[in-house]
């Protein structure tokens, strides 16, 4: 039996234990969905290097781990959650520790009428299903999506009514605390016609223990809706992090999504945006900063299905030490999507001769009246620029820090939420300072 097949069987056993632990709290309809998802997972199995989309990312280390479900949380974690909040950010926050919602630690700024924010478990127990956005992720295609459905316990549900403008950011904080814990959170977001909202997702670790986060987010934007979305992953170096995001945009909607990956030992981010109406404006920004033996894999698919839409994708990576990275970005333009304006760029900075990046931007175009461009760069710091700064009295390490911070700053400065931007500038600066010091 192969390692992949063996671990598939192991997860089936854990699923049977999980279902028994629910003690009938899962509705019949949801239980059926769970079992169908597990059947699909068994059929799919874990991806391997033979799968083109996983060609450069091995799951061997993940498959050697025995993950479990946390039943009880430590008091020390519950008392220290403020340490992971964004300083000076006035938000309405939902806090989850090891996948469990913490109402006593949640709340904050009040939300206007027409906005419903809750943890998913409360809806699942009441209705047995969540109706907004749950059909966006394709079924039977991705093993981790199926695992998320099979082991789903909690997550976040956001619904913004038509025409409502939410000035207060909605912040979701996921804290991983227990060793060998596996959590499978779900985010379901619906922004109705003409509504506006800002969502901040943050993932952190409270210890150095191995753990797994396998998240699935589904966002649905109505006509002329606006959503600013920020996702920051800063878990520990022993963490495994799998993230899937599926977005559906109706006509004239605007999405600005920024994904920052700073932590995790092995991280896989997959984003699929589907531009389903005319005049959609979709932006994907990304920054990944990895060092040591970290591995980060970013896959994006922007699908243009209707005319007169524009998309802008800008991902930058900084890789130090023995770290590795993958970027595979695809823009798919259907025949009906005339007058598409699409731009994609992936730029990478290697701070070590041992660091490695595999980048593959792609255009797949079936319309003849479009303006599409893409490109990728891989390089090191400009020695002429370093020499110039040193000639002005700046030390070698400081000069390298100035240049690398400027490189990362092209993404960070696009964050429109000032407290989050300031925090990331500080976090990125400290990481780069350490990475450059290790290089010396």
Question: What positions do the PLM features span?
Answer:
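Short, low-to-moderate order helix/coil transition modules at the start of elongated helical scaffolds
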Residues: 1-216, 223-226
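Conserved beta-strand/loop scaffold segments within soluble protein domains that form the structured core
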Residues: 123-127, 132-394, 408-440
